[in-house]
């Protein structure tokens, strides 16, 4: 009951309904992470309490950003072990989710989670964001792109903004010190058709984690040349 109460409290804070079904799905997800993490490297966070607080509650906090609540479609880029895409799907069943990752082993894990939890309207893509963002069925097709991946904001923006339709949002889940990244990325975000709309500070209760949600609105279409070819984005971020 302790974990149920912790998760319910976090959901209450962002006006989300929470029930036994959602709780059981999250616990099953936690168990699968712990089981698969013995075979492949999914996360360094493996204890029950830490997975609940540092992964699940961190993902719940993304609902502090108003665009998530109204979104019909979302792509999670560089999803890794499924964060934040799978918790978002569990907590908001009516949203269509696409999980994108470059490692086949992680895709195998994610498909197992989707099957075990009987999640609907959720798909996995194996490959690079740079490639999928040029495909007509994915380019500028999503209400929301989100990423919790470790990369600077200028790089993440070029990976993610091309997936977002005009009027949609890219939400970057960043660490505590984001001001310099934002300053360095402002021009690249503008080039890609985005505009920083909000920065939401996030505290994770009973942990030392302090995060920021950078909310970027897509105000114009992304030019056809973006994203650039694989390898170029990280070597030469837009400035």
UniProtKB/Swiss-Prot annotation:
Per UniProt, S-adenosyl-L-methionine binds at 78, 83, 129-130, 148
Xref: InterPro entries: rRNA_ssu_MeTfrase_G, SAM-dependent_MTases_sf
Keyword tRNA processing, does the record have it? no
Q: What is its EC number?
A: 2.1.1.-
Specify where it is mainly localized: cytoplasm
* Gene3D superfamilies (alphabetical): Vaccinia Virus protein VP39
Record key words, sorted? Cytoplasm, Methyltransferase, rRNA processing, S-adenosyl-L-methionine, Transferase
Q: Which GO terms describe its cellular component?
A: cytosol
Any GO molecular function: rRNA (guanine-N7-)-methyltransferase activity
Transmembrane domains' residue ranges: none
Q: Where in the cell is it found?
A: Cytoplasm
Signal peptide range equals none
**PANTHER family registered for this protein in UniProt:** S-ADENOSYL-L-METHIONINE-DEPENDENT METHYLTRANSFERASES SUPERFAMILY PROTEIN
What the protein does comes down to: Specifically methylates the N7 position of a guanine in 16S rRNA.
Q: Which family does it belong to?
A: Belongs to the methyltransferase superfamily. RNA methyltransferase RsmG family.
Under what name is this protein listed?
Answer: Ribosomal RNA small subunit methyltransferase G
Q: Which organism's genome codes for this protein?
A: Clostridium botulinum (strain Hall / ATCC 3502 / NCTC 13319 / Type A)
Gene name in the database record: rsmG
């Amino acid at each position: 009951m302790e974990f149920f109460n912790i998760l319910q409290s976090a959901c209450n804070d962002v006006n989300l309904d929470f029930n036994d079904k959602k709780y059981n799905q999250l616990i099953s997800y936690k168990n699968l992470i712990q089981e698969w993490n013995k075979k492949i490297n999914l996360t360094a966070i493996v204890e029950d309490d830490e997975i609940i607080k540092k992964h699940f509650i961190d993902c719940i906090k993304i609902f502090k950003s108003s665009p998530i609540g109204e979104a019909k479609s979302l792509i999670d880029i560089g999803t890794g072990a499924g964060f934040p895409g799978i918790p978002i799907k569990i907590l908001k069943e009516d949203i269509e989710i696409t999980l994108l990752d470059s490692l086949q082993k992680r895709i195998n894990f994610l498909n197992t989670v989707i099957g075990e939890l009987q999640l609907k309207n959720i798909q996995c893509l194996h490959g690079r964001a740079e490639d999928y963002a040029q495909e007509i069925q994915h380019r500028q097709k999503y209400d929301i792109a989100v990423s919790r991946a470790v990369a600077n904001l200028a790089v993440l923006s070029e990976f993610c903004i091309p997936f977002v339709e005009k009027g949609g949002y890219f939400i970057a889940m960043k660490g505590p010190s984001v001001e310099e990244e934002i300053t360095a990325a402002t021009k690249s975000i503008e080039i890609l058709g985005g505009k920083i709309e909000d920065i939401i500070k996030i505290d994770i209760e009973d942990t030392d984690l302090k995060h920021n949600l950078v909310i970027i609105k897509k105000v114009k279409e992304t030019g056809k040349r973006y994203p650039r070819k694989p390898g170029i984005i990280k070597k030469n971020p837009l400035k």
